Regions:
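Catalytic domains of lipid- and phosphate-ester/thioester hydrolases
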Residues: 1-530
Length: 530
């Protein structure tokens, strides 16, 4: 299972996915969640994933963990806490907001635990391969905070913490001292909101002199969504490893029966439109050349008035004109210096010696050029780049015939009004009972409307946004598992015993879906603080 990035939108939706899988029971006291052996997370999705890994290590009940984490997401004001901490920091250029966020996560969410707490209790966890994904800002490669279980030559099991990539890695002795909050902060460190988290400077290993002395490389880490916002690549790596080391060497099919992708990103985007003029028309018609002429004219006029006051012998007007003349002259000098520096900077770009032509451009034209370029760059980095990466990530599994009948995706937007389910219902590829009710559609529309932030605003809380997102993750997983079971009942190729186990859960899924149709939030716990 992979949890996508997307701030609190992803964290809450993915938590809903996790909680629903834990509600479907199998024989022997297990749940569907207990069948998840490989887990990856990116950015906001790392919040529920890392907390789940620690809960398993501590032997905590999953339902209790879900309720506590949902309360944390709904009620804790992390940004205010972080800003207060940042303002109290001693004034220095190394003050780091992401380091402070990591410390807050560790204190409020993880109880000041370390990776050693998860590693030493890995046998309690059904997940045998977990990766929290970040991006190495030294070489643009994925940086994996990866925990795996392996076998020793004598048959005993050993848990490994493999943190890094082909260029940078963190030694195993140091891995034990990395905290869950630090890994989570790196994974969710979005460029527009935070600076890179520097290793080892911003990590608690700096408190251990014996560890720091052996660290040779220094590098920055940021949001894993920059390289893989769906977290699919770590799952494929986990599958390769499991296939290599599985007991039955005669099997050649995939080692994983099913990949579940819990995803809050969207394939849709608004098309580009030029920005509208913000400058008043009177200002927009000006040019740098005309502004310079106005400055010179005003200086001449003030100088003439100064001479008139001098001839008339008026000390009052002489004083007033002296002050005005000084101000106008100073303004012209400052303007000339700034213009000279601006042109010098522009000449270093592709414009070169043609910089002088800018003097003839109207301010409205300059505004349009700057705003439209800024808008297109932001759109390219925050929309087009991520949409294309999403297509490539999904293509890695959906375009591979070996994954046929082994992929389920659950997305936050798919059950809104006007989505693909409507055309599927019309052409008969979606069972009538899976058409979402009006209540489910409206809840999905609300859930999908949230932006990518690491908090819920007061307005969003008043709207019930956290509850809508948790519910969307729950009924979305239910809906997609039912749709998947319908599909494999018609096409039984590339299936295993694990799929028959999933099909046996259909009565529970049907009962839950009927409840969701009537009340989409029937599974959402009440965590409202009085």
């Amino acid at each position: 299972m992979s949890f996508s990035g997307g701030g609190y939108r992803a964290a809450t939706f993915d938590l809903g996915t996790l909680s629903f899988l834990n509600s479907i029971h199998l024989d022997g006291g297990r749940t569907l969640l207990d069948c998840v052996v490989a887990l990856s997370s990116v950015s906001g999705g790392t919040i529920p994933a890392m907390r789940y890994m620690l809960a398993r290590a501590r032997g905590e009940g999953v339902d209790k963990m879900v309720e506590e984490l949902f309360g944390f997401l709904c009620n804790e004001d992390l940004m205010t806490d972080a800003l207060q901490r940042l303002s109290n920091e001693k004034a220095n250029r190394d003050a780091s907001s992401i380091k402070i966020m990591a410390e807050i996560y560790d204190r409020l969410l993880f109880g000041n635990s370390t990776m050693a707490d998860i590693i030493d209790n890995f046998d309690r966890n059904p997940v045998k391969d977990y990766t929290a994904l970040a991006t190495d800002f030294d070489n643009s490669l994925p940086f994996r905070f990866r925990l795996t279980e392996g076998k020793m030559s004598d048959g005993s099991r050993m848990t490994y913490g493999v943190f890094g990539n082909q260029k940078h890695s963190i030694g195993r002795s140091v891995v034990r001292h990395i905290t869950p909050g630090e890994a989570m902060a790196c994974s969710s460190c979005y460029p527009s909101g935070f600076e890179p988290m520097m290793y080892p400077d911003d990590f608690q290993v700096m408190r251990h002199d014996e560890l720091v002395s052996g660290i040779k490389s220094r590098f920055g880490l940021m949001d894993g969504g920059l390289v893989d916002n769906q977290g699919i690549e770590p799952i494929l790596l986990a599958e390769e490893r499991m296939r290599k080391y599985r007991a039955d060497k005669s099997r050649t099919d995939k080692a994983l029966d099913l990949i579940i992708v819990s995803d809050v990103s969207s394939p849709y985007m608004e098309g580009y439109a030029p920005s509208e003029q913000a400058l008043p028309d009177s200002v927009g018609r000006l040019t740098l050349g005309r502004l310079r002429n106005y400055g010179l004219i005003s200086e001449v006029v003030v100088m003439l008035l100064f001479i008139v006051a001098l001839v008339l012998g008026s000390n009052f007007w002489l004083g007033v004109m002296s002050v005005i003349l000084a101000i106008v002259t100073l303004a012209n000098i400052i303007g000339a210096v700034l213009k000279s520096k601006m042109f010098a900077a522009i000449r270093k770009t592709f414009v070169g010696d043609r910089a002088a032509f800018i003097s003839h451009l109207k301010f409205a034209t300059i505004e349009a050029m700057l705003m439209n370029r800024a808008k297109s760059v932001i759109m390219m980095s925050s929309e087009i780049f991520f949409k294309r990466m999403r297509q490539l990530n999904y293509g890695a599994i959906y375009d591979d015939k070996e994954w046929h009948n082994r992929v389920v995706s659950s997305t936050v937007y798919e059950l809104r009004p006007g989505e693909r389910w409507e055309s599927m219902k019309r052409n008969g590829t979606l069972a009538d009972y899976l058409a979402p009710s009006e209540a489910v559609q409206q809840n999905s529309a609300l859930a999908a409307s949230m932006g990518t932030t690491l908090w819920f605003t007061a307005e969003e809380k008043a709207q019930g946004m956290p509850q809508a997102l948790l519910a969307a993750g729950q009924y979305g997983m239910c809906h997609n598992l039912l749709d998947y079971i319908d599909a494999i009942e018609k096409d039984g190729t590339n299936l295993t015993e694990g799929h028959r186990l999933l099909v046996s859960c259909k009565p529970q899924l049907l009962a839950a879906w009927q409840k969701f149709q009537e009340n989409p939030r029937w599974m959402v716990p009440d965590v409202t603080r009085s």
